[in-house]
């Protein structure tokens, strides 16, 4: 599975700026920007950001106003502020932290970013698990379990994701899984016939990949009008007016 996935990734990965001449700083910036934001939206912002703030030290010495201004348009401004705080910490590093646990203690860094940074930039065998990975994994293994929500699915599937990590190329493996989810294993109309791991995919071979993952649909909240209260106060107001 890993060999098929990585061979495909080596030949078909998208040409993204944070993959060219990669560094710890570029990985951190890209992962912060890509939280809840599409790659196509991030691309121009990433290039401008790197030109303006080429390293942790430059970012750390910038004012918060400059940082937020450079982020303007990407939304979720807490990401920019946390990134600024992280840069101030990083500018004093003699060596970066090497474990997921240590990274999760930094501003704005959750399980996903911690695993992405440690695997991509530091070559540690730590698997990422987000919505893309949930979709890919539940389809490959045809996992019938219904999850309460996406966050629950990610937490439950993290051990499975970890068991599949390629220890020789953990960063490339994580990026390949993300690439697969973004470009082939779509939420709707997945491109199963061109999938590099189709031979390993139970739901794909059975022809019902779109049935996975199984996430409970959110129930619409029902709002009730308290007719009695409305009528009572309406009549009371009328009496007062008379």
Residue spans of the language-model regions?
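Generic N-terminal initiation segments characterized by hydrophobic and/or small/turn-forming residues
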Residues: 2-3, 80, 227-233
């Amino acid at each position: 599975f890993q060999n098929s996935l990585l061979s495909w990734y080596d030949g078909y990965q998208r040409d993204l700026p944070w993959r060219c001449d990669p560094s710890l700083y570029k990985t951190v910036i890209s992962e912060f920007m890509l939280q809840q934001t599409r790659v196509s939206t991030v691309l121009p912002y990433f290039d401008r950001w790197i030109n303006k703030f080429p390293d942790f030290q430059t970012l750390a010495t910038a004012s918060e106003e400059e940082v937020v201004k450079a982020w303007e348009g990407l939304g979720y401004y807490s990401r920019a502020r946390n990134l600024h705080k992280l840069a101030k910490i990083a500018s004093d590093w003699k060596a970066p932290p090497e474990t997921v646990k240590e990274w999760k203690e930094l501003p704005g860094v959750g399980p996903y970013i911690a695993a992405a940074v440690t695997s991509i930039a530091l070559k540690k065998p730590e698997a990422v698990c987000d919505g893309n990975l949930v979709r890919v994994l539940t389809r490959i293994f045809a996992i019938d379990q219904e999850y309460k929500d996406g966050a629950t699915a990610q937490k439950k599937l993290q051990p499975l994701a970890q068991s599949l990590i390629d220890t020789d190329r953990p960063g490339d493996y994580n990026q390949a899984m993300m690439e697969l989810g973004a470009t082939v294993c779509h939420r709707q109309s997945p491109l199963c016939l061109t999938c590099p791991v189709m031979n390993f995919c139970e739901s794909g071979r059975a022809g019902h990949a779109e049935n996975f993952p199984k996430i409970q649909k959110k129930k619409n909240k029902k709002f009730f009008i308290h007719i009695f209260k409305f009528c009572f106060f309406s009549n009371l107001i009328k009496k007062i007016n008379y």
